[in-house]
Amino acid sequence: LYCLIIDELSKVWSSPNCPKSILDRIKRCHHHYEPKCDHMTKFNTVHVHGQGTWEFRLWGNTKSPSEVKFCIDNSIDTFRSAYNRYYARDNSMFDRIAKLYPNEKLEYTFPSIARDAMVQGKSIETILADIENSRLASTTRESVG
């Protein structure tokens, strides 16, 4: 599992349970992203429960760790609609991911892309465009060759 660093998603779920100082600490530990984040904090990644709940937890470095948890309940559809409300784009982002990785579940591909975006300091949109462009370039090379 990845240590998934939330930036864009934290804007979607700007929860009162998640103080800004914690978000700052999450962002600061992006270079220790796998399998856990030990830079001031331990940030445990996405747990996809039986019903498709996405859960993010942050532990402080204490004997009785405080836990910050924000869940999007029930299903990937709930997660999808929250994300789309933020981007105001139907399901286009998820459709693009599904086209790029037709044989893989969104539960796995999306966190991986989000992690890459954080590590590289790019938006998810930019990461998707990079993947699409590189695939287009390799397809063009094959047809020419």
Where are these regions (language model features)?
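C-terminal accessory/tail domains of diverse enzymes
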Residues: L1-G145
